[in-house]
Amino acid sequence: MVWVTVVVQWAHVALAILWVGIAVTVGVVLAPVSAALPLPQQRAFGLRLGKRVGPLFGIAGGGTMLLGILRGTVFGPLHSLAAFTSLYGLTFIVALLLTVAVAILGGGPLGAGAERLYADDALWQVGPDSSLPPALVAAQQRLHVLARWELGGF
C-alpha cells in the first residue's frame, strides 16, 4: 500500500508542477510575445493557444486537486472530522481553499474571458486611424490583471 501512496504523492506533485508551469509560461512568456504581434496574428495565436492549453489546465488543475484530496484523506492522516482541527488538517483546508480559488479564477473569469476575447470579431476591428479598439485594450488589460492574480495564487 505504501507504493500507492508514493504514486499518488508524486503524481500530485507532477500535475501541480505542470499546472503552475503552464500558467507561468502563458502569462510570463507567451502573452507578452503575442502582444507584440500584429492584431490578426495575435488573434490566431490566441485561438490556437487556448485550444491547446485549455484542456491541459483542466487536467493538471483537476488532477492536482483530486490527488491532493486523496493524499490528505485516503492516503494521509485525515480520517475523521477531528483530524481537520490538527495543524495538518488546518493546513490542508487552507491549501484546498486556495487551490479551488485559483482553479475558479483560471477556469472562470480568466479562461472564459480569453475565449470570449478571441471569439469576438468586433473586438478585433482596427479603427480607420489604425488605433486599437478601446474594448480590446480593456479586455486584454483585464485578462493581464487576472493572470497576475492567478500566478500570485500559486
Regions found by a protein language model. Give the residues of each.
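Polytopic transmembrane helical bundles with strong interfacial aromatic enrichment
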Residues: 1-154
